[in-house]
Amino acid sequence: MDKKRVAVFIDNSNVFHNLYDFRKSDASWVCLYDPFLLAKRLAGERKLFYTGFYCVRPPSYLIAGSEEDKRRYNITQKYYGLIEKNPSITVKYGDLKGGIGALQEKNVDTQLGTDMVAMAALNQYDVAILVSNDGDYRSAVENTKRFSKKIELLFFRGSASMSLRSVCDITRRARLSFFKKMAGLDGF
């Protein structure tokens, strides 16, 4: 029997904020995780066909800010640069709109949801694994299932959308062991 083809869709902003919150009470959680190792872990013995990493670049105003702001900007740029170098990961950037203290992400959810449905329509995978707590993906999941695809959800405790969880075939809670620090970020 052929192995199922798996596509992993990572909403990094959602993941990062959850990991950051967990890290406040348990320093062993890593925010700058390796998305490819996460995807491989989630795919298991199945064939990992696609790893999509959806994110936004850090705001440029951080460069002119405090030393801590500059450090955060540089860490994020280095982190995304390392991810972009991995040919097994597709990185897609959304936009930040608004001013300092009132920034909003735009187009991350849209890109991820569109890719999930379009790739299902093209029969590029058998199983989609969504890594997010965001209920905005419910419509994308429902439309993906119209193409007879299975949907798995990796969610974070405490803030997972019940609406999203209810339409997924399999739900798993994120575990510390799923997130390994990205190599090359020593000193950060």
What are these regions (language model features)?
Residues 84-188:
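Nuclease catalytic cores that cleave nucleic-acid phosphodiester bonds
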Residues 1-104, 150:
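Domain-level signal for Mg2+-assisted phosphodiester chemistry and nucleotide/NA-binding surfaces
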